[in-house]
């Protein structure tokens, strides 16, 4: 395999996502990734990315082709993601447990040329016809003992996957052209909807690199300890927070991303006790899990310096409990809330250890502009509440194949400044801190995932026996969930069978957080004075 001599020698692609890491690998030879006790250097990372890129090139993947990755945070996922980026193709990263039907719709929508799935999930997706399917696996990066037992332990799940491993593809004999355009589309991330029918956000390399460029600003004088430090990278890459902050930002700052395929409290505990972790990024429900366990209540947490939380509303008690445990164990680490959205890749506003305010989500990055507007688009003054708008170098290019939604969400003002209308309500105080009051959009979040009630309702209304329905969000601070109310189309229907049928259908079509925890069949859906379903009354019925 070979690469364009001009680009490889001159590092002309250094401003691309992979170009940043390739450049660093020539300067730093420390640990880039950790996974299940094994460490992988920047040199190993570069070598594997080059090999994966060669295999993809041999499969016919070229600039602007779409490659879908449906796999958890394992080393081969990272190699594949960077390899796709290096040759100028587009990464479309989705939930590793996405239902086959929803995935096939997404592949058609994006015109994907290749699908990469976890080898344990091959049998679930093997009948998809939209594009060729290859598998990626943690096997090659496991310890010798785990490597030996892997095909035995997962024999039933690996059935049929033999011969489809991406690493079995020969290297190309053609020279590979490296991408040098940081402004072209390079990543597709779903906007967080509950099915494959939600919007797909189009991002470029300039946007995905942006968070890593601001790590020094976020950490302040503590940045001098960043090189060689570990960041817990278990938030999945289909989430902008996981992609840009959990994986990419550490690597662009000479640090280490500690990968996890799934949340593993025992493994996190080992990393903390070995004093290999310095930074944590979490979403609220995972922070609660960590606080309930024994992972954080150990003197070794004194090595932690920063913990960042976002992607969902956080109960204030989470901050006080976390900070109390840190103080008890002589750690200066504090839980710091930030704010962003997929349309900005991830966080663009954050509290810092030395500049924070309780209840706020912090201040904007240096090149980020914030404003709050009223219903007529007028800019509001300090402490006045309205819709939050963001202008930043990391704004998405728009929504895939949806000009109407793009034009509605991304607007350019009279000064030529481009803004994203977040749909969130809040205000900026006199010190420049942003406070979030709630969501204007008709959606809610559970475990960091955007849940659209309309998706749930549209799907339910198509099920036999359902006349009408309404999905409501029950904001339980310890365990938020969806409650679905159904009006059947017959008085003689077996309600228990109807509930069972609805649950089975939704479980097959929706991500698990969107599947209603409660399903209630009622005689009549309450209506407002204008004839709309009164969801406030339904919440009261929960």
Predicted regions and their residues:
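Conserved AMP-binding/adenylate-forming
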Residues: 35-38, 53-98, 230, 234-236, ...
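AMP-binding/adenylate-forming catalytic domain of the ANL superfamily
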Residues: 508-532
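Conserved AMP-binding A3 loop
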Residues: 41-43, 177-180, 186-213
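AMP-binding/adenylate-forming catalytic core of the ANL superfamily
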Residues: 77, 98, 105-106, 115, ...
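Conserved ATP/PPi-binding loop(s) of AMP-dependent carboxylate-activating enzymes
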Residues: 363-367, 378-410, 449-451
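Conserved AMP-binding/adenylation subdomain of ANL enzymes
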Residues: 209-230, 238-279, 293-294
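Conserved pre-ATP/AMP-binding loop-to-beta segment of ANL
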Residues: 153-190, 197, 222-230
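Gly/Ser/Thr-rich phosphate-binding loop
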Residues: 278-281, 291-357, 369
């Amino acid at each position: 395999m070979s690469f364009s001599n001009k680009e490889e020698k001159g590092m002309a692609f250094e401003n691309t996502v992979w170009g940043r890491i390739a450049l660093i690998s020539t300067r730093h030879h420390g640990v880039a990734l950790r996974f299940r006790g094994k460490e992988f250097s920047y040199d190993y990372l570069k070598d594997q990315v080059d090999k994966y890129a060669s295999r993809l090139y041999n499969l016919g993947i070229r600039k602007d082709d779409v490659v879908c990755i449906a796999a958890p945070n394992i080393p081969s996922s990272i190699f594949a993601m960077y390899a796709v980026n290096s040759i100028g193709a587009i990464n479309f990263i989705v939930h590793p447990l996405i239902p086959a039907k929803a995935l096939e719709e997404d592949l058609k929508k994006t015109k994907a040329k290749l699908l990469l799935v976890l080898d344990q999930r091959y049998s679930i997706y093997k009948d998809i016809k939209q594009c060729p399917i290859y598998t990626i696996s943690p096997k090659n990066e496991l310890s010798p003992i785990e490597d030996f037992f892997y095909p035995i332990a997962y024999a039933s799940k690996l059935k049929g996957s033999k011969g489809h491993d991406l690493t079995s593809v020969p290297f190309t004999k053609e020279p590979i052209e490296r991408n040098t355009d940081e402004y072209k589309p390079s990543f597709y991330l779903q906007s967080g909807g509950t099915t494959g029918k939600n919007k797909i956000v189009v991002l470029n390399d300039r946007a995905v690199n942006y968070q890593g460029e601001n790590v020094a600003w976020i950490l302040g004088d503590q940045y001098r300890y960043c090189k060689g430090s570990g960041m817990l990278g278990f938030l999945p890459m289909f989430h902008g927070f996981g992609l840009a902050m959990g994986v990419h930002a550490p690597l662009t700052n000479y640090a280490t991303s500690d990968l996890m395929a799934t949340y593993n409290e025992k493994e996190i505990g080992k990393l903390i006790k070995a004093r290999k972790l310095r930074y944590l990024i979490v979403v609220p429900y995972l922070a609660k899990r960590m606080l309930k366990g024994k992972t954080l209540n150990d003197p070794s947490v004194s090595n932690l310096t920063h913990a960042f939380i976002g992607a969902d509303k956080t109960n204030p008690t989470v901050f006080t409990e976390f900070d109390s445990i840190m103080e008890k164990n002589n750690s200066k680490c504090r839980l710091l809330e930030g704010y962003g959205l997929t349309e900005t890749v991830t966080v663009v506003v954050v509290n810092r250890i030395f500049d924070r305010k309780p209840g706020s989500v912090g201040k904007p990055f240096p090149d980020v502009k914030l404003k709050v507007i009223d219903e007529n688009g007028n800019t509001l003054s300090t402490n006045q509440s309205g819709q939050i708008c963001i202008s930043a170098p990391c704004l998405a290019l728009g929504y895939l194949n949806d000009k109407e939604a793009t034009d509605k969400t991304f607007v350019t003002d009279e000064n030529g400044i481009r803004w994203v209308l977040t749909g969130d309500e809040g205000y900026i105080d006199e010190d420049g801190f942003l406070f979030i009051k709630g969501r204007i959009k008709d959606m809610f979040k559970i475990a960091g995932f955007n849940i659209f009630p309309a998706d749930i309702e549209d799907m339910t209304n198509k099920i036999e026996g359902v006349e009408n329905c309404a999905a409501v969000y029950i904001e339980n601070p310890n365990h938020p969930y969806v409650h679905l109310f159904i009006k059947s189309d017959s008085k003689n229907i077996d309600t228990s069978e109807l509930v069972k049928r609805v649950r089975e259908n939704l479980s097959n079509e929706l991500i698990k957080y969107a599947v209603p925890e409660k399903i209630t069949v009622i005689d009549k859906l309450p209506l407002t004075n204008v004839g709309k379903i009164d969801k406030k009354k339904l919440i009261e019925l929960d």
